[in-house]
Amino acid sequence: MNIIRAKTAGFCFGVDRAVKLTYDLLADGHKVATLGPLIHNPQVVEDLEAKGALTCPNVASVPDGYEVIIRSHGVPQTVYDEISTRRLAYHDATCPFVAKIHKIAMRADENHALLLVAGDASQDRKSVV
């Protein structure tokens, strides 16, 4: 049997970027709250919470004085609007590749084009489209 070991392992670029941003902000003394778990990795989420990050289910539950971290898969425009209404500072950790897909979807909508997205509509990565 021939065993081939992967050259790399770990998070994808977008998730790694979001995790690093959050750890850096916490290390600099910022009060941060993520909208839902930052990533789908309970050990990392627990470590972030142990360092002071809050995991909030929505913008309304973010305490005053906390900075919001937008997760790597992004959020719908309505969430940005809620953050603005509450005048909360935020850090957008949306993966650039995901943001590109969001722009394509918005352009399709503006042009009244039919946009088909396959998968579970309630899944957080697809529900923003």
List where the protein language model places each region.
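Conserved phosphate/oxyanion-binding catalytic-loop motifs
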Residues: 70-76
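Conserved small/polar residues in nucleotide/adenosyl-binding loops
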Residues: 128-129
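Ser/Thr/Gly-rich flexible loops in soluble cytosolic domains mediating phosphotransfer, phosphorylation
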Residues: 84-113, 117
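Short acidic low-complexity segments
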Residues: 54-63
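N-terminal beta-loop-helix "entrance" segment that forms/cooperates
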Residues: 36-53
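Short internal beta-strands
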Residues: 31-38, 117-119
